């Protein structure tokens, strides 16, 4: 949000310095990102006077100008279309650097004629994109003076960062109101001249859905002259980067930036059959504005997928979810976002319909995002408009047009909808403020601050009944009121207290353990990512049932309106974005919170792999990641925590999360505690994110993972046996429903003194085996710590193992 000091002073009696204003704005939560002073940036450019001109002897489009400067008369070659004698202009002397292109002015020869400087345009000084001609200054400008004070550039510009909840300060008046509450100046009363209406509009206004359009107002204005707006208005808009076009357009921009209420002007002569406004959602119920007859244009949900051509010169295909303003010839505007090209105003416009309305913020935001249209109107409408000021803004705009555009005929206001009802009071107390902020204020001090901010208060003993003003849509709970009091009272007045001493406890041990988990995965080639804990509810419902308590009351955007039930959507989204950039091989992990409901929050270590493994090794052709890769990585993490995936955790295939493949994923538990899941991501999830390669992931609930003191942070001592190891291969035929992991786990524990490792190297099922059977082939490493195993020892082990497998799993040794 940009505004100038003079713009602020239109609404605020203030004598404070620019520095004091900037500091006060930041103190009350309106962070000042920058203060721009064009007079300092352009102080070397001076006023000059063109005494006379003559044609360039070698170039028809160039002129030789005799220019009066503080250093005498200089010859300057100029090709601007408006260059002429007897005008004051902006001169860049030799040695000065032009802002556009950082061009340093030198004495030059242009087509055989010397030139000793440059006459500047707005574009060259980066004041606008206007390059049609050189800047013309007022006749009373003094030659040699800095030109900025004659061109309205001695007006400091404030650039503030407005948070999404503060739509009320997207107008300079709202900023002035906050500064006044802080004690920096006095808010001026708005001067509202009475508008004498000369006719009743015959335009019929229909609104089908109050939720989509709670208030729509307009006036007809006839016989106006759409001439250029006055200098003061042009300069205000130019200083904040808004292109000036005509009186009508400039007034609508001025009202929008002054009061945060978008205004739109339609050329009434371009509306076929007159204009009428309808807002409906495929419904027969109509809320009509009485005493109007000609119904030819409608504000409605577009259900004909018609093309809409906007004033930005682009065409858009609207859907039934977009709120459109139409007449008999088609769509004339996208409600709350942008007007249509067909009914746009130009210099010859004489009759207009001036609209001020409030639209559903969520609908405006959704349409703007889908169609990728960013406008000032959308920016304000999607942050909620003060419905109680809408008609007042329309009247201010009407008065301004009447004062600029000559004697006009004005209709009565045509309106459908009502002002916003007064909010319910909240019971606030001194004790609540002290409890959550530590600030002790009297009831009178609290009431004084709130009244200055526009709140209605009523003291009942120790309780203040507080009603938020209509422009503060973000005030809903007691904490919101406390925040308002503190920001005006001053954060700098809050006394600092000594922090309690820190003691080493389980939180520190937990931190160390998580750091170790990160190092393990990083050493295996994973990249750590940190993503937002909020996500789109549309995406979230693919991963878990939506819970009412997890919706954000005041989301930054609709894409971040829900607390994530799992970290996986964020990681899968990263995979999708990387694939779009032709990055196909990925391994990511994140440690972050997931939310079951408002009362249950768990910290998860989530990892994801996709694409090829070891594809950069020149000695290997590489292979694609598979489920055993993610399982192996999870095993290493769990083993570091002092547990074992095979020995301590019961593998459970029941009730898998809906985003995993139903037959290629498993849950992992420690007793009754669910520790997480690992496996392949469901194809429907991949399709939703437009991913065409397999993804494998694990989720480990660190909150449920016990801190095992005896094991944590320690490794068993690694010893090398003095005796030879022996390897034996076995192939067992077992029933298909026997889990391979269970069999391997059993063999590992069959003879702990001899079995050092078990590796699966083949699984087969086919025509050569009986129906319902499968063959698993394993390699076992056998080694004793006290002797070399003899052939008798090995044969005895084999006989015992085969017999045990037969008894436990009804397996037979395959010949």
Curated annotation (Swiss-Prot):
Known catalytic reactions: tRNA(Phe) + L-phenylalanine + ATP = L-phenylalanyl-tRNA(Phe) + AMP + diphosphate + H(+)
SS bond partners: none
Top enzyme category: ligase
Domain FDX-ACB, residue spans: 721-814
B5 domain sequence ranges: 421-496
Entry EC number(s): 6.1.1.20
Residues annotated as domain tRNA-binding: 39-148
Cofactor: Mg(2+)
Keywords in alphabetical order: Aminoacyl-tRNA synthetase, ATP-binding, Cytoplasm, Ligase, Magnesium, Metal-binding, Nucleotide-binding, Protein biosynthesis, RNA-binding, tRNA-binding
Cofactor: how bound: Binds 2 magnesium ions per tetramer.
GO MF, one annotated term: magnesium ion binding
Record localization: Cytoplasm
Chain positions recorded as Mg(2+) binding sites: 474, 480, 483-484
SMART domains to which the protein is assigned, alphabetical: B3_4, B5, FDX-ACB
Family: Belongs to the phenylalanyl-tRNA synthetase beta subunit family. Type 1 subfamily.
Subunit structure: Tetramer of two alpha and two beta subunits.
Name recorded for this polypeptide: Phenylalanine--tRNA ligase beta subunit
Species the sequence originates in: Rickettsia prowazekii (strain Madrid E)
Gene that produces this protein: pheT
């Amino acid at each position: 949000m940009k505004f100038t000091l003079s713009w602020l002073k239109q609404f605020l009696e203030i004598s404070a310095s620019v520095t004091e204003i900037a500091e006060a704005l930041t103190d009350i939560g309106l962070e000042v990102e920058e203060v721009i002073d064009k007079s300092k940036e352009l102080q070397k450019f001076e006023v000059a006077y063109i005494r006379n001109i003559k044609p360039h002897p070698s170039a028809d489009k160039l002129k030789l100008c005799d220019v009066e400067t503080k250093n005498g008369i200089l010859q300057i070659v100029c090709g601007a279309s408006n260059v002429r004698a007897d005008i004051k202009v902006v001169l860049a002397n030799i040695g000065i650097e032009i802002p556009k292109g950082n061009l340093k002015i030198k004495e030059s020869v242009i087509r055989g004629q010397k030139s000793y400087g440059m006459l500047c345009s707005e574009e060259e000084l980066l004041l606008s994109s206007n390059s049609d001609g050189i800047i013309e200054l007022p006749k009373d400008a003094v030659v040699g003076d800095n030109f900025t004070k004659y061109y309205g550039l001695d007006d400091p510009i404030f650039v503030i960062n407005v948070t999404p909840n503060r739509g009320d300060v997207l107008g300079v008046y709202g900023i002035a109101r906050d500064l006044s509450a802080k004690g920096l100046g006095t808010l001026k009363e708005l001067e509202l001249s009475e508008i004498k209406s000369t006719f009743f509009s015959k335009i019929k206004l229909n609104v089908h859905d109050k939720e989509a359009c709670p208030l729509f107002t307009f006036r007809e204005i006839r016989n106006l002259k759409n001439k250029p707006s006055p200098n003061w208005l042009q300069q205000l808009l130019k200083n904040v980067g808004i292109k000036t076009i005509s009186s009508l357009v400039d007034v609508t921009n001025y009202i929008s930036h002054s009061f945060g209420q978008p205004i739109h002007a339609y050329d009434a002569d371009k509306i076929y059959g007159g204009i009428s406004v309808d807002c409906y959602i495929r419904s027969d119920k109509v809320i009509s504005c009485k005493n109007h007859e000609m119904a030819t244009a409608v504000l409605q949900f577009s259900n004909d997928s018609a093309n809409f051509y906007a004033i930005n010169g682009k065409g858009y295909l609207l859907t039934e979810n977009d709120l459109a303003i139409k007449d008999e010839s088609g769509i004339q505007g996208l409600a709350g976002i942008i007007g249509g090209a067909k009914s746009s105003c130009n210099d010859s416009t004489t009759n207009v319909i001036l609209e001020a309305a409030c639209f559903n913020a969520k609908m405006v935001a959704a349409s703007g995002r889908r169609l990728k249209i960013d406008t000032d109107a959308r920016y304000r409408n999607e942050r909620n408009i003060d419905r109680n000021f809408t008609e007042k803004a329309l009247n201010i705009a009407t008065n301004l047009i009447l004062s600029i555009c000559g004697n006009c005929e004005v209709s009565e206001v045509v309106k459908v909808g009502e002002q916003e009802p007064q909010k319910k009071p909240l019971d606030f107390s001194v004790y609540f403020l002290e409890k959550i902020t530590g600030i002790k204020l009297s009831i009178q001090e609290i009431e004084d601050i709130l009244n200055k901010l526009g709140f209605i208060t009523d003291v009942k003993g120790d309780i203040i009944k507080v009603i938020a003003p209509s422009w503060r849509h973000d005030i809903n709970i007691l904490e919101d009121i406390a925040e308002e009091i503190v920001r005006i009272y001053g954060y700098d007045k809050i006394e600092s207290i000594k922090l309690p001493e820190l003691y080493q406890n389980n939180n520190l041990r937990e931190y160390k353990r998580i750091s170790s988990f990160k190092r393990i995965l990083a050493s295996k080639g994973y990249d750590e990512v940190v993503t937002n804990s909020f996500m789109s509810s549309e995406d979230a419902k693919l991963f878990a049932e939506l819970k009412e308590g997890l919706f954000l009351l005041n989301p930054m955007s609709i894409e971040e309106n829900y607390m994530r039930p799992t970290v996986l959507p964020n990681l899968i989204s990263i995979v999708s974005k990387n694939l779009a950039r032709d990055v196909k091989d990925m391994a990511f992990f994140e440690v972050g919170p997931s939310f079951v409901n408002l009362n249950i929050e768990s910290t998860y270590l989530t990892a994801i792999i996709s694409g090829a493994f070891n594809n950069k090794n020149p000695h290997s052709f590489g292979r694609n990641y598979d489920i055993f890769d993610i399982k192996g990585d999870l095993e290493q993490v769990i083993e570091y925590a002092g547990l074992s995936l095979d020995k301590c955790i019961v593998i459970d295939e029941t009730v898998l999360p809906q985003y995993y493949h139903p037959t290629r994923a498993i849950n992992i538990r420690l007793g009754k505690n669910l520790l997480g899941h690992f496996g392949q991501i469901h194809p429907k999830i991949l399709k939703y994110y437009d991913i065409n390669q397999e993804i494998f992931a694990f989720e480990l609930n660190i909150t449920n993972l016990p801190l095992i003191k005896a094991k944590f942070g320690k490794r068993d001592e690694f010893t090398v046996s003095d005796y030879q190891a022996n390897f034996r291969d076995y192939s067992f035929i077992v029933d298909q429903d026997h889990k391979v992991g269970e069999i391997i786990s059993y063999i590992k524990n069959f003879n702990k003194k001899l079995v050092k490792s078990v590796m699966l190297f083949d699984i087969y099922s086919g025509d050569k085996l009986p129906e319902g059977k499968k063959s698993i082939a394993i390699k076992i490493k056998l080694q004793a710590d006290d002797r070399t195993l003899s052939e008798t020892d090995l044969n005895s082990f084999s006989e015992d193992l085969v017999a045990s497998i037969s008894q436990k799993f009804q397996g037979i040794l395959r010949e």
